[in-house]
A protein has these predicted regions:
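Membrane-interface junctions
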Residues: 9-13, 22, 42
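Short amphipathic alpha-helical segments at helix-loop
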Residues: 31-37, 41, 72-78
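Membrane-proximal amphipathic alpha-helices
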Residues: 38-50
Length: 178
């Protein structure tokens, strides 16, 4: 009888209910907060990668027409010292500058080797587009792409998900200096 009476009094008692609610909800709220933080961090890194690829493509699309051996491929254009403008474009993508000294990477762990730059052509023999390189019917596009394996803070593992692999891509038509 006393056990039943004690159980009824505990059931009706509301002293300490806030402590119990807090103990139950705190882990759930911390997990939600951590997940929101992790996903926002991934989106932030993606925007940095997109900005880097965009900047690199724009830079190489405006590279001067100094082609060795009469080649008109902007991916093969070099400066007076013989350095490929493509190398400078990769540095701009990763560091935000043509020089790597004194500059930090936009995203930690992202290297110039992760950036791929190609210069595919498209046919302009019909003359529909302004010819920026005389003597050829091909127009060039500058395509910069990258892939980055995002190191996780651990919340993806809680959900049994693998960390995302962030990719970014930007394309510009080669227009030369101006």
């Amino acid at each position: 009888m006393t056990l039943l009476r004690t159980a009824r009094s505990l059931w009706r008692d509301n002293v300490g209910s806030a402590l119990l609610e807090g103990a139950v909800l705190t882990p759930v709220l911390l997990a939600v907060l951590g997940g929101v933080y992790e996903f926002s961090w991934v989106f932030y890194k993606q925007k940095l990668l997109e900005a880097g690829t965009r900047d690199a493509a724009r830079y190489l699309a405006r590279a001067p027409l100094t082609f060795p051996g009469g080649n008109t491929d902007p991916c093969l254009a070099t400066d007076a010292g013989g350095t490929l403008y493509k190398t400078y474009a990769k540095n701009i993508a990763v560091y935000g500058s043509t020089s790597t000294s004194g500059f930090n990477q936009r995203v930690n762990g992202w290297a110039t080797g992760d950036v791929t730059i190609t210069c595919p052509t498209f046919d302009n023999s019909a003359g529909n587009y302004l010819q920026n390189v005389q003597g050829t019917t091909n127009l060039y596009r500058v395509l910069v792409s990258t892939s980055y394996a995002e190191p996780s803070l651990g919340f993806f593992a809680l959900l049994r998900l693998s960390p995302p692999n962030i990719t970014a891509r930007h394309e510009e038509r080669y227009i030369g200096p101006g």
